Regions:
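Append "and occasionally in soluble cytosolic enzymes with long acidic Gly/Pro-rich linkers
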Residues: 145-150, 199, 227-325, 330
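Periplasmic binding protein-like
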Residues: 25, 186-189, 201, 320-335
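Aromatic- and charge-enriched surface segment that lines or borders ligand/interaction sites
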Residues: 2-47, 75-77, 178, 225-227
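Ligand-site clamp/hinge motif
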Residues: 17, 121, 151-197, 328-330
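Surface-exposed binding/hinge segments that line
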Residues: 15, 34, 53-110
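Gly/Pro-rich hinge or "lid" segments in bacterial periplasmic/extracellular proteins
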Residues: 92-159, 163, 171, 278, ...
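Short, well-ordered beta-strand elements
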Residues: 11-14, 33-36, 74-76, 131-134, ...
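Ligand-binding "clamshell"
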Residues: 195-207
Length: 335
């Protein structure tokens, strides 16, 4: 359970579940929680790991410290009241301090910092958490094998599967072929044009619209054309989102913003995101661009990943749309 201070809303008290063990058999307790907070916030801690900060601390920016009250009680301090903190703490990814210490003791390195970095590298290949599955084998970019954690704290939720094998397949057609050939039992984000074939073969498609908008992160460095609000508005007006929905076989919802209209955070925006090429062209000409003098931009895009569903087709579609509004985008595909 958890509670926030009656007087000080930056103080959070968490009561930990008794009897929970990490996969290596060590206890999940207050010391472990404090240790895991330190790994991303305390640069002086031996086990501080800068490589984890981006995927942990950046997602809970208000977290400032952790303090042990007793064996199963922890007090967290945030920089300000933050209703999302309990949810965002799932991004901390609790690791076993004892398992890491064993990796540290066995690691080679000229300095403690070198040994710490080596220990985290070894930990990543042989991790120890507290979930219903344990890591059995890990081959980077090839496969991850998980086995059931028979000592999971909740017997009612102990997995019925003995083993799960996860195989990275960046290309949607390769994933689909693996499913249809029986190589795998489940895939994420198949090619939209093969969904009828998949369903005809007796497979079930599970889909659901979710509030997950995948934006382009624009450069606001000095001299960037994106600093001009007219250019940003033009780009938004130039993307045919209904056309993208068709491209994806209907497997998307057309967004009006980061949150949908009617959401408590919607506010009263003055700019209406819609598809209006003529209005976009007018804004671009006001900003000094034209068909004869297009704006040049470069976009780094991912070749894979479930976040943007179909990153290559989607990120090919956007530059095609923008071209009609005097924006020429060169794509740099990153693995």
């Amino acid at each position: 359970s958890w509670s926030v201070g009656a007087q000080d809303k930056t103080k959070w008290t968490f009561k930990l579940r008794p009897g929970v063990k990490f996969h290596d058999g060590s206890a999940f307790n207050a010391d472990a929680v404090v240790w895991n907070v330190q790994k991303v916030l305390d640069k002086d801690a031996l086990h501080f790991d800068a490589s984890q900060v981006g995927v942990t601390a950046s997602r809970m920016p208000t977290l400032r410290s952790a303090r042990k009250i007793d064996e199963l009680t922890v007090e967290l301090t945030s920089s300000e009241p933050d209703a999302f903190l309990p949810l965002n703490l799932t991004n901390l990814f609790m690791a076993s301090p004892a398992h890491w210490k064993a990796k540290f003791d066995a690691a080679a390195g000229a300095t403690p910092a070198d040994k710490s970095k080596a220990a985290w590298t070894a930990f990543a290949a042989d991790a120890s958490g507290s979930g219903p599955f344990k890591m059995a084998r890990f081959l980077p970019r090839e496969r991850l094998e998980l086995v059931a954690n028979k000592t999971y704290w909740d017997p009612k939720r102990t997995t019925k599967l003995d083993r799960v094998v996860m195989i990275p397949m960046p290309e949607a057609n390769a994933r689909t072929a693996a499913l249809l050939s029986g190589q795998v039992d489940w895939i994420e984000a198949p090619s939209p044009d093969v969904i009828p074939q998949i369903t005809q073969r007796g497979f079930k498609i599970y889909s659901n619209a979710q509030p997950h908008v995948w934006p382009w992160q624009l450069s606001f460095v000095e001299g960037s054309p994106w600093l001009d609000k007219r250019v940003r508005h033009a780009a938004n007006l130039c993307v045919d989102r209904e056309g993208m929905k068709t491209l994806l076989g209907g497997m998307m919802a057309v967004p009006k913003g980061t949150v949908p209209p009617g959401h408590p955070w919607w506010g009263n925006p003055k700019f209406d995101i819609k598809y209006d090429v003529k209005a976009a062209q007018a804004l671009m000409m006001q900003a000094g661009f034209s068909a004869a003098k297009p704006m040049k931009a470069k976009a780094q895009i991912s070749a894979s990943g479930p976040g943007p569903m179909q990153p290559l087709p989607m990120n090919e579609f956007v530059p095609q749309s923008l071209k009609s509004c005097f924006i020429d985008v060169a794509s740099d595909v990153l693995e």
